[in-house]
Amino acid sequence: MKKFLTTAPVFAAIWFTVTAGIMIEFNRFFPDLLFHPL
């Protein structure tokens, strides 16, 4: 359990960074799709 408590925040931080990066890149190439969904 102690290993989970030290690994979970690191994994969450990496996951949110990757997700934010994907959203930023997607918004740069397809800016209209995020603000005007079909």
Swiss-Prot record:
Superkingdom in the source lineage? Bacteria
Protein name as it appears in the record: Photosystem I reaction center subunit IX
Q: Which GO terms describe its biological process?
A: photosynthesis
**Membrane topology term:** Single-pass membrane protein
Q: Where are the transmembrane segments?
A: 4-24
Q: What does this protein do?
A: May help in the organization of the PsaE and PsaF subunits.
Looking up Pfam families in the UniProt record yields: PSI_PsaJ
**GN (gene name):** psaJ
Query: What are the UniProt keywords, alphabetically?
Result: Membrane, Photosynthesis, Photosystem I, Thylakoid, Transmembrane, Transmembrane helix
Cross-referenced SUPFAM superfamilies = Subunit IX of photosystem I reaction centre, PsaJ (SSF81544)
- Family per record: Belongs to the PsaJ family.
- How is this protein annotated for GO cellular component? photosystem I; plasma membrane-derived thylakoid membrane
Give the subcellular location.
Cellular thylakoid membrane
